[in-house]
Amino acid sequence: MTIFLQATVEGLSLAAIYSLVALGFVLIYKSMDVLSFAQPALAVVGAGLISSLAVDRGIPFWISLIIGITLTGVIGLIVERTFLRPMVGEPVFSVAILTIGIDILLRTTLDNWIGLNPRYMGDPFPTFGTFGSAEIGGVTIKYLEIAGLSTAILIILLLNIFFRVSKYGVAMRATSFDQEAALAQGINVGRIFGLVWFIAGILAAFAGFFITGGFNTLSQTSFVVALRALPAVVIGGLDSIPGAVVGSILSLIHI
């Protein structure tokens, strides 16, 4: 029973991380009808930015985290403006292939910038230790797993409020439902596309940190871990945010 509970805790932690990547997949698909294969690369880029700022430049970790996550969102926005905006009206398959090229470009740029060697992410809790853990009923729970699960739940709740209450959230929902109708109502669809990619970049950066934090490091395999969120999206539904979260429970099978 203890082994089962331990596997369940670790599986839920992975599911939380996968859900952050999966939400980015879904947001982009709902707004643009395109499956973006660049999400895993954005996760790795986000982790690389955080590591570079915190470890290489000695910037306090929490400041590095905020800057790294924000910059990843900006990179997502730049990707949409530079590569995807000119592709509006092109076949969906062509745009999806383009996102594969963007994925390769982002990862190659990151490798040339910070190198291929595994990298430490920095310690957000120097007093307690990122590698610390608590034991409850014979089950060991790492602090980083608790942080990852809590962060994912908080982000999902905030996104739900954002989509229901805020002006831009409602505009994003309208755009995902019918772009032409949204345009007729005066919604700036191009701005919504940019916002979607900005949010997707932020979600990916959070996931990238939790994938590479703790005992893990930022390496070539980090991309593969982020890519495992894709099956969860396919099973949960490419246009379903709740489905992306539920589908991420597939990470339990990985355990």
Predicted regions and their residues:
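Single transmembrane alpha-helix segments in multi-pass membrane proteins
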Residues: F4-V55, I78-S94, R173, V233-P242
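Helix-loop-helix "hairpin" substructures at the membrane interface of multi-pass membrane proteins
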Residues: L14, I136-L218, I241-V246
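Extracellular/periplasmic helix-loop junction at the C-terminal end of a transmembrane helix
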Residues: I104-E135
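Alpha-helical transmembrane segments in multi-pass membrane proteins
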Residues: Y18-A22, L42, G46-I50, S64, ...
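Alpha-helical transmembrane segments within multi-pass membrane transporters and channels
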Residues: G58-I102, T109, V246-S251
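Glycine-rich helix-loop "coupling/hinge" segments at transmembrane-helix boundaries
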Residues: Q39-L42, G214-I241, V246-G247
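Mid-bilayer segments of alpha-helical transmembrane spans in multi-pass integral membrane proteins
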Residues: V74, I100-L116, E145, L157
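Conserved small/polar residues in nucleotide/adenosyl-binding loops
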Residues: I253-I255
